[in-house]
């Protein structure tokens, strides 16, 4: 028996520094799609290149809050989301792929 996986690769144009706008793109795809897996690009939430924005604690706090909101909205939904975003962990900054399932 062959099982199929439905995959959506989102090629969008995130706006540099506009976390709210970029987050809404993610939410819209999450809420309006029946795929098993949704893949977003590198630095989806911050836009590219974020340059010195990612060095500002208030900006990174907004990134973490946006990821938390997406996680909460995805609870009970089927798609797994892979989201490219900068991630600050214990003072270390990473160019990360966050998997939300």
Q: What role is predicted for each listed range?
A:
Residues 1-101:
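Hydrophobic structural segments
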């Amino acid at each position: 028996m062959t099982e199929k996986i439905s995959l959506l690769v989102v090629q969008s144009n995130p706006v540099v520094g506009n976390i709210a706008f970029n987050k809404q793109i993610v939410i819209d795809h999450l809420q309006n799609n029946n795929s098993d897996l949704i893949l977003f690009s590198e630095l989806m939430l911050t836009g590219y290149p974020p340059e010195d924005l990612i060095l500002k604690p208030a900006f990174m706090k907004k990134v973490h809050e946006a990821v938390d909101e997406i996680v909460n909205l995805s609870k009970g939904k089927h798609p797994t989301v892979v989201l490219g975003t900068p991630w600050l962990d214990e003072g270390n900054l990473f160019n990360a792929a966050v998997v939300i399932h």
